Amino acid sequence: STTGESSSTSGGNEWRHFVVPFDGYLDQVVVRSEEACGSTIVGLHKSSTGTELPNTTASTTVTVDMTTDDTAYKFDFTSSNTFSAGDIIAISFDPTNDANDTNATTILVYDGSQGV
């Protein structure tokens, strides 16, 4: 598949994963869906230099109850949310209910003095 949607972090990394240019952390992810997704888990997956793909197990997750459709919800990350320059990362989205069309914005905070 050449889309940005996948149920796995394996393969297709040129479409769904990216390399962070600086040390930093995941501050938050804002998600909006056309459906009431119910209890939803968003996770940060990462791997360091020398590993092709982000880890299939999230290093940290946040759960939010997305009870209303067409409404933005904030997933606020506070621990185990750091990454290092050159890491490959991915964000996972795991809703209880079918999400259908969903949009998300990821807010990363970089330390510009610690780059690749």
Language-model regions, residue ranges each:
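Generic intrinsically disordered, low-complexity segments enriched for polar/acidic and small residues
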Residues: 12-15, 70-74, 80, 90, ...
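Terminal beta-strand-rich extracellular "head" domains
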Residues: 32-85
